[in-house]
């Protein structure tokens, strides 16, 4: 029997304060298993992939079909993940109240819902966007359910490093929707999300390592401990910051404005990584980094969209013109 008393973590923080409890934020069972809290960030990176393409901005109907199809595919992946892990969820306090382990929804009904969402996503993307976008969405779904959930997660502490490919596919979907192909800029954002994912997820895993240890999931904090995990977070955090700067060249226009606006985002990310590195056991710092990393990726995608506005292109032209004038007049010497 699972205790109803919130379990305290180091620093006097409960799991319910880290990940909102389903007892406090009650969703309908059919919506809960779709993991709707994860979908907005996936759609944001899809928009980022679109903004990097020459086909931006998209016609309204194609934009709606892309985001709608992506949301349905993400929902299907979330449901299939819940079906696969229902026994595991039932053994962890944090997840024991979810729809499937608690019996509020049957696995059969959930599976029918997942198949329905998958078919609807494929139909919407094929008819309203293109086959490449549809195929990439289905690849992301399969990567999450099969590669990450079924194969990597229960077997290796590097599960999220490789399995992060699933969460990095939406930018490719966006690029395919905008231009019919995936160029280097789309692959840049794919790579950025891949590098961002381990630091983001390991910050959460530090908070929940007791849960993972109890059910035998070999997350990095469970196998290597907080100190090694925080060092890995630092490496991936720095790699994320370095790669994010290449967006200046990945953008068709507006890259200079993107680069300037990126500076405070990267500075804050590195500050929080450094603070966690100084106190690997500090729950508040791990929680802060986890939350900021979400805001960071939303911010990157917003910067990509803003950088495609006409005013961003004008800013770039004026800035480069000013720099050329200063160079020709010898003011840099």
Curated annotation (Swiss-Prot):
It comes from Prochlorococcus marinus (strain MIT 9313). Converts heme B (protoheme IX) to heme O by substitution of the vinyl group on carbon 2 of heme B porphyrin ring with a hydroxyethyl farnesyl side group. This is Protoheme IX farnesyltransferase. PROSITE patterns: UBIA. The chain crosses the membrane at residues 63-83, 109-129, 132-152, 160-180, 188-208, 214-234, 245-265, 292-312. It is found in: Cell inner membrane. Gene3D superfamilies: UbiA prenyltransferase (1.10.357.140). Pfam families: UbiA. InterPro entries: Protohaem_IX_farnesylTrfase, UbiA_prenyltransferase, UbiA_prenylTrfase_CS, UbiA_sf. NCBIfam families: cyoE_ctaB, PRK04375.1-2. The gene is ctaB. It comes from the Bacteria. HAMAP family: CyoE_CtaB.
């Amino acid at each position: 029997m699972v205790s109803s008393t919130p379990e305290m973590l180091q620093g006097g923080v409960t799991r319910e304060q880290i990940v909102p409890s389903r007892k406090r934020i009650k969703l309908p069972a059919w919506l809960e298993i779709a993991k709707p809290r994860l979908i907005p960030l996936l759609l944001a990176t899809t928009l980022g992939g679109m903004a990097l393409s020459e086909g931006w901005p998209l016609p309204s109907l194609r934009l709606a079909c892309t985001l709608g199809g992506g949301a349905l595919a993400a929902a299907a992946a979330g449901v299939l993940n819940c079906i696969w892990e229902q026994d595991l969820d039932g053994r962890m306090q944090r997840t024991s109240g979810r729809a499937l382990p608690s019996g509020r929804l049957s696995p059969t009904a959930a599976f029918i819902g997942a198949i329905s969402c998958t078919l609807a996503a494929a139909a919407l993307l094929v008819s309203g966007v293109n086959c490449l976008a549809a195929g990439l969405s289905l690849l992301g779904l399969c990567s999450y359910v099969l590669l990450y959930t079924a194969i990597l997660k229960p077997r290796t502490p590097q599960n999220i490093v490789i399995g992060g490919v699933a969460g990095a596919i939406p930018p490719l979907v966006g690029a395919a929707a905008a231009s019919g192909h995936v160029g280097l800029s789309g692959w840049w954002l794919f790579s950025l999300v891949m590098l961002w994912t381990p630091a983001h997820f390991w910050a959460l895993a530090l908070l929940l390592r007791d849960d993972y240890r109890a059910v035998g999931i070999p997350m990095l904090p469970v196998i290597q401990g907080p100190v090694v995990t925080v060092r890995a977070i630092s490496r991936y955090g720095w790699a994320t910051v370095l790669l994010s700067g290449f967006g200046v060249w990945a953008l068709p226009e507006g890259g200079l404005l993107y680069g300037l606006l990126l500076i405070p985002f990267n500075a804050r990310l590195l500050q929080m990584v450094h603070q966690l590195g100084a106190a690997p056991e500090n729950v508040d710092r791990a929680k802060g980094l986890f939350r900021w990393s979400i805001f960071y990726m939303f911010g990157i995608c917003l910067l990509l969209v803003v950088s495609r506005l006409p005013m961003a292109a004008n800013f770039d032209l004026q800035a480069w013109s000013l720099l050329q004038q200063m160079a020709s007049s010898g003011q840099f010497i």
